[in-house]
């Protein structure tokens, strides 16, 4: 499968990119090179390869939540520009 110059121009238009003539040629060549490499990978015999979902055999590596001592709420809120009901008060965004 080859990508044509027109396809690169179309994708650039959709992405709102203004490519020079040189960039069009370069991007077309690079994309075709990537597709050629992907085509080579399709030809590999993977019958003896076990299917995997992850490249690294890690499982859940999260730790348990643990409450640790921290600053008192009053001390933290004392540094806030504005606080209300024990929380930081911030300007409404939406």
Swiss-Prot record:
GO biological process, one term: regulation of translational fidelity
Domain of life the protein comes from: Bacteria
Keywords tagged on the record: ATP-binding, Ligase, Nucleotide-binding, Protein biosynthesis
TM ranges: none
UniProt-recorded Gene Ontology molecular function terms: asparaginyl-tRNA synthase (glutamine-hydrolyzing) activity; ATP binding; glutaminyl-tRNA synthase (glutamine-hydrolyzing) activity
UniProt catalytic activity: L-glutamyl-tRNA(Gln) + L-glutamine + ATP + H2O = L-glutaminyl-tRNA(Gln) + L-glutamate + ADP + phosphate + H(+); L-aspartyl-tRNA(Asn) + L-glutamine + ATP + H2O = L-asparaginyl-tRNA(Asn) + L-glutamate + ADP + phosphate + 2 H(+)
HAMAP family reported in the protein's UniProt record: GatC
Primary role: Allows the formation of correctly charged Asn-tRNA(Asn) or Gln-tRNA(Gln) through the transamidation of misacylated Asp-tRNA(Asn) or Glu-tRNA(Gln) in organisms which lack either or both of asparaginyl-tRNA or glutaminyl-tRNA synthetases. The reaction takes place in the presence of glutamine and ATP through an activated phospho-Asp-tRNA(Asn) or phospho-Glu-tRNA(Gln).
PANTHER family, A to Z: GLUTAMYL-TRNA(GLN) AMIDOTRANSFERASE SUBUNIT C, MITOCHONDRIAL
UniProt similarity note: Belongs to the GatC family.
Protein name: Aspartyl/glutamyl-tRNA(Asn/Gln) amidotransferase subunit C
UniProt organism field: Desulfitobacterium hafniense (strain Y51)
């Amino acid at each position: 499968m080859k990508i044509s110059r027109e396809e690169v121009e179309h994708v650039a238009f959709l992405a709102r990119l203004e490519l020079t003539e040189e960039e069009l040629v370069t991007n077309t060549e690079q994309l075709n090179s990537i597709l050629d490499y992907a085509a080579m990978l399709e030809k590999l015999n993977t019958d003896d390869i076990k299917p995997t979902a992850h490249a690294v055999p890690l499982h859940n590596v999260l730790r348990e939540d643990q409450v640790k001592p921290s600053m008192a709420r009053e001390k933290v809120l004392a540094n806030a520009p504005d606080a209300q009901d024990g929380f930081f008060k911030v300007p409404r965004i939406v």
